[in-house]
Amino acid sequence: MHSVFSYLNESLILFLVTVMGFAFLVGIFLGKPVIHWLKKQNYYDQVQKEHCAKLETLHKDKKYTPTAGGVLFFLVLLMSIFFLLPLRKPSTWLFVFSIVSWGSLGWYDDIVKKKRKKGHGITAKQKFIVQLLLSAVTVITVFFIDKENSLFCTLQVPFFRTIFLGSSILAKLFCFSLAMLAIIGTSNAVNLTDGLDGLATGITCMSSFGLLIVAIMSPTNPLAYDVSIVLATLVGISLAFLRYNCSPAQVFMGDTGSLLIGGILASCAVMLRAELFLIFLGGVFVAEAGSVILQVASCRLRKKRIFLCSPLHHHYEYKGIPETQVVARFWMAGLLCTVLGIVAALWR
């Protein structure tokens, strides 16, 4: 195992902690004005859920809670990037593209939900097509930032080491596909996890911190420094948003937040060539998305449900476990996943 201290630069750690603090304070300061604006614009959560009468009953008190609070993530992340990253670097504009594009997709979905009586957003097919395009632009940009492709065709393997897959077309195709899968999968997984007060926000904070450790331990990666700043900002704003999102929530992140978080978190992993670490660090996200996939597959193939309701957190709600207990237990699982991911990074 490498000594973690061999990777830690005291000035870098102090700087990243300062970035976290900056993001936290700005998020706390902007939180109430953003919530007030969302209420004024009537961005309220839609509780009408077809075939989920029990969820409507359980969440009936949430209909007066504003959604689309992800604009807070949008604003603070952009502020941090424009203040702290050099504008001449292509990676800076890749971050800007990721935040603006994924945030805009989520924002549009929230707008559509607001206008429709039953709270339906854009169709899954429409969303997937846009996600496919956005992830492709991100991966292609990373490919061309790395002119020699020595970075793009490497892969950080948990508990093992960083491996070079070669410069063949097959290796590039594999890396391209893995990166696309990571971005699309993570954006949807975070979106599915965002269903209870504070759940997705808390898990985001933990997984972002874990990936930040991976970034710090990737000194040979030319993009690691910039990625670490973005991740430190994401940790800080997540903590600030949790102030307003924990039970009883004053605001929900909505698709504006969940799609943005998933998109930028996975984009950071792609730039670090650490997509496989998302399986550990985002273990709760994986479980939530996996429960939906299994439920749909079982209903179509066996005509039976595996879970009382999916995603997984709703299954436990259906069993009568209070929302705060479900969130607390998922947070504990998320913490264990984060610790496991950090150990996987150190044990190499």
Swiss-Prot record:
It comes from the Bacteria. GO terms for biological process: cell division; cell wall organization; peptidoglycan biosynthetic process; regulation of cell shape. The chain crosses the membrane at residues 11-31, 67-87, 92-112, 128-148, 163-183, 198-218, 222-242, 251-271, 276-296, 326-346. It is found in: Cell inner membrane. Pathway: Cell wall biogenesis; peptidoglycan biosynthesis. One of its GO terms (molecular function) is UDP-N-acetylmuramoyl-L-alanyl-D-glutamyl-meso-2,6-diaminopimelyl-D-alanyl-D-alanine:undecaprenyl-phosphate transferase activity. It catalyses: UDP-N-acetyl-alpha-D-muramoyl-L-alanyl-gamma-D-glutamyl-meso-2,6-diaminopimeloyl-D-alanyl-D-alanine + di-trans,octa-cis-undecaprenyl phosphate = di-trans,octa-cis-undecaprenyl diphospho-N-acetyl-alpha-D-muramoyl-L-alanyl-D-glutamyl-meso-2,6-diaminopimeloyl-D-alanyl-D-alanine + UMP. PROSITE patterns: MRAY_1 (PS01347), MRAY_2 (PS01348). One of its GO terms (cellular component) is plasma membrane. Its EC number is 2.7.8.13. It is a multi-pass membrane protein. Pfam families: Glycos_transf_4. Its cofactor is Mg(2+). Belongs to the glycosyltransferase 4 family. MraY subfamily. Catalyzes the initial step of the lipid cycle reactions in the biosynthesis of the cell wall peptidoglycan: transfers peptidoglycan precursor phospho-MurNAc-pentapeptide from UDP-MurNAc-pentapeptide onto the lipid carrier undecaprenyl phosphate, yielding undecaprenyl-pyrophosphoryl-MurNAc-pentapeptide, known as lipid I. HAMAP family: MraY. This is Phospho-N-acetylmuramoyl-pentapeptide-transferase.
